[in-house]
């Protein structure tokens, strides 16, 4: 019996450390063998689950969050794997390694080492199942794009533009079925696919891991969709025991990858065969088997999941009204990520043909209302290689403008952009919209602003009080705006054209009540930075 660490005994902070062990091959190791390890440093213990990787190889993965010496010891019901022990010296983090993303300042994000993380996502559901040539093209595209996260599926996807079969499957294939899209994703049983759900295909997961690591190398988080309804193979209709075993296997393999997020579902409410109790169980299994505390969410189609669930870290939402981020962040007390706001493109489906201008506006609407927004692209160029499904190249107009917005955000406050509560937009939203406005309340000065000279501030604005204010005027096209910064403070004033990607200094020094004049056009923003 031998054991080896694939890192040759070396390890570094926030990098996956792996132990590879040789064990039994008889019977069904996926069912029969239990393996875990305890990593210790002083009084601390971190328990990790092992998994079978095929061909008699068992693996344990650990994500060190502290430098120095760690010891490890295995526990298993297989004698050959039980009671093994060793140690590893964890060195300093390698360049670019910051650890998993966490929630910070209630509504924002940061890496585990405190480095700021700005959530700017895109969606390419099964880019990782398209063969090496297209997958490598997608990675090259992402390396030049502004996105810091990609939403992607663990399982393959059945839908229009997704009739090709993957090279591998997550479970042992018993009988191949049909692949043609017939206009409906319902009824996976009619396609004739059969799998042995008691036997995983390790090569499928190794390929997924390869792509996740390649995303990490270019600074992109993998927001992994664990379940989804778009299915011709039966993966959305496994039994509860099969679902649970899949979750445990997946978390054992991937929890030690620093750039993984758990998205329990894409459109959980389109899987009526799974009950609220099922989703609660899935959340708990995933969180219980992730000792490294990755972000976790549940994405909707129609009805929101209850984002107040204590183990949900952020609200992953499908809605076009990104401006509602201001309401949802207060409702849930968590970061809001509008992970589907429709797609820039030209396909027939209603959600897949908004303009680049609309996509950019939704990004800005989300940001100035304290949220984050995810991009998607669905251009019909006569092929079925569409970014939203398969990746490849990005051809839309929104991407460079999202990059422009990202730069503005990066240059903004380290704490993140929070809605400014004195604006008309904020106060109307907090009263439940125009239908619910109580006029007297609308004009009562917010706490702390009593006695301030009047200054109309209707536009949604985000920033940090007394330091930084970013207002977005959307499709409106005023020719002037009143400066509504706090009294007795001076600010620089910059006009931002979010579509033309320009910044024009309007004044080096303004104060409350000053009036700024500029050429009227839509999609403008005003940025005020304190100078005194």
Predicted feature locations:
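Short beta-strand segments within Ig-like beta-sandwich modules, predominantly Fibronectin type-III
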Residues: 50-52, 507-510
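Surface-exposed loops/turns
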Residues: 54, 66-67, 487, 512, ...
């Amino acid at each position: 019996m031998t054991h080896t660490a694939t890192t040759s005994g070396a390890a570094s902070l926030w990098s996956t450390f792996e132990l590879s062990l040789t064990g039994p091959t008889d019977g069904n190791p996926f069912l029969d063998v239990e393996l875990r390890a305890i990593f210790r440093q002083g009084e601390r213990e971190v328990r990790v689950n092992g998994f079978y990787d095929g061909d008699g190889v068992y693996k344990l993965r650990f994500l060190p969050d502290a430098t120095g010496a760690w010891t490890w010891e295995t526990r298993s019901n297989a004698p050959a794997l039980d009671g093994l022990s060793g140690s590893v010296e964890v060195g300093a983090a390698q360049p670019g390694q910051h650890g998993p993303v966490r929630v910070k300042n209630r509504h924002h994000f940061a890496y585990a080492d405190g480095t700021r993380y700005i959530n700017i996502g895109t969606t390419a559901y099964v880019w990782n199942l398209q063969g090496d040539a297209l997958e490598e093209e997608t990675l090259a595209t992402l390396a030049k794009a502004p996105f810091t996260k990609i939403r992607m599926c663990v399982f393959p996807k059945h839908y229009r533009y997704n009739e090709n079969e993957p090279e591998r499957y997550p479970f042992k294939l018993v009988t191949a079925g049909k692949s043609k899209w017939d206009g409906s994703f319902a009824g996976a049983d009619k396609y004739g696919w059969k799998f042995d759900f008691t036997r995983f295909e390790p090569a499928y997961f190794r390929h997924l891991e390869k792509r996740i690591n390649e995303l990490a190398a270019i600074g992109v988080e993998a927001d992994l969709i664990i379940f989804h309804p778009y299915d011709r193979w039966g993966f959305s209709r496994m039994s509860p025991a099969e679902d649970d075993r899949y979750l445990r296997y997946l978390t054992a393999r991937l929890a030690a990858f620093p750039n993984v997020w758990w998205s329990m579902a894409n459109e959980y409410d389109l899987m009526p065969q799974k009950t609220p109790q099922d989703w609660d169980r899935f959340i708990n299994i995933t969180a219980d088997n992730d000792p490294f505390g990755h972000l976790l969410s549940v994405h909707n189609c129609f009805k929101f999941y209850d984002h107040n669930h204590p183990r949900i870290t952020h609200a992953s939402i499908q809605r076009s009204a990104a401006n509602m981020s201001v309401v949802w962040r207060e409702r849930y007390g968590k970061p809001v990520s509008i992970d589907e706001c429709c797609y820039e493109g030209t396909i027939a489906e209603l959600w897949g043909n908004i303009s680049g201008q609309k996509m950019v506006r939704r990004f800005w609407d989300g940001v100035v209302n304290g949220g984050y927004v995810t991009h998607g692209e669905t251009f019909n160029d006569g092929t079925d290689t569409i970014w939203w499904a398969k990746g490849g190249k990005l051809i839309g107009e929104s991407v460079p403008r999202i990059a422009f917005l990202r730069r503005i955000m990066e240059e903004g406050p380290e704490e993140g952009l929070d809605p400014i509560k004195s604006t008309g937009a904020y106060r109307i939203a907090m009263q439940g919209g125009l239908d619910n406005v109580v006029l007297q309340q609308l004009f009562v000065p917010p706490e702390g602003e009593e006695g301030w000279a009047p200054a109309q501030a209707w536009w949604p604005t985000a920033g940090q009080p007394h330091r930084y204010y970013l207002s977005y005027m959307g499709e409106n096209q005023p020719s002037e705006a009143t400066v509504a910064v706090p009294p007795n403070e001076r600010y620089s004033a910059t006009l931002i054209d979010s579509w033309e990607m320009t910044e024009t200094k309007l004044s080096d020094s303004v104060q409350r009540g000053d009036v700024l004049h500029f050429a009227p056009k839509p999609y403008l923003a005003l940025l005020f930075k304190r100078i005194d």
